């Protein structure tokens, strides 16, 4: 049984489409930092890169958990075309810090996505704990520190758009 040490439960659905040795979600489960689940609940925040809505700090009051769907980017369109119960949100633009997709916009691992969500929702301490489990975790934070801070202060999607403009980031996917 998982002990909840954070404000919210952290869940992952592992679809086992990638190299298991490189699976960031599996590592979180192994260290007891996330629950491996099969179905999402109605009160979970589902991180979905194709959602129509962007994650905002105010979303925290709507949910009691965060769920990352661990799948291959090669299968992501098909995976996220399926319906997951819960509140679906996408992250604003961020740069990957992982060695496979280093500095690519929005090609995040599950741990990067969960960490970014935690930071935006106001839990930078848990984000730091998660990223510390990976040799490259600090790289993700270094690349996105200012963005994450600004995103965590945004009160609306239009503010997210302004932040993206200030940083010269394309938000056409938004």
Regions found by a protein language model. Give the residues of each.
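Short, extreme N-terminal leader segments that mark the start of a protein/domain
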Residues: 1-34
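Active-site cofactor/cluster-binding pocket
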Residues: 21-26, 31-109, 113, 120-143, ...
